[in-house]
Amino acid sequence: MKIAVLALQGAFIEHEKKLEQLGATCIELRQKSDLDQDFDGLVLPGGESTVQGKLLKELDMFDDLQKRIQDGLPTLATCAGLILLAKEIENQNQTYFSTIPMMVKRNAYGRQLGSFHTIEEMKGIGKVPMTFIRAPYIESVQEGVDILSKVNDNIIA
């Protein structure tokens, strides 16, 4: 299985290492020509969603990736990636891919000092270690969106 990892900014290396441990082959998406390769899934990593969104547009990668996601490309998104997929971002007019009917709250857990680690239940998987560093959470979802996990009554997956 070949997984493309958005590698413009953020925590892409951590995702690649874990995917390779699980037996996947990873390719990094850094420029438009990288999208010419075949891949079976996509990872949108944590980082800074505003920077990632800006770079995707400047590098002319945005429309192609948005179409692939809309067409059903399996996509894993963490932190900034979650923000990129949201149809609404609390207190912000601009959205990015807008592919999941949900509203997210950026930096919902506060500043760096508000970071924490926990182990919580993930639907269909079991207990999963989770780390939150200036992480978003999901304020609300529309019909058809499955909630996979909550932390302190906040939707996180």
Task: Label each PLM-derived region with a short phrase.
Residues E48-E120:
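Cysteine-nucleophile active-site neighborhood
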Residues F12, L35, L84, N91, ...:
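Flexible, glycine-rich phosphate/dinucleotide-binding loops
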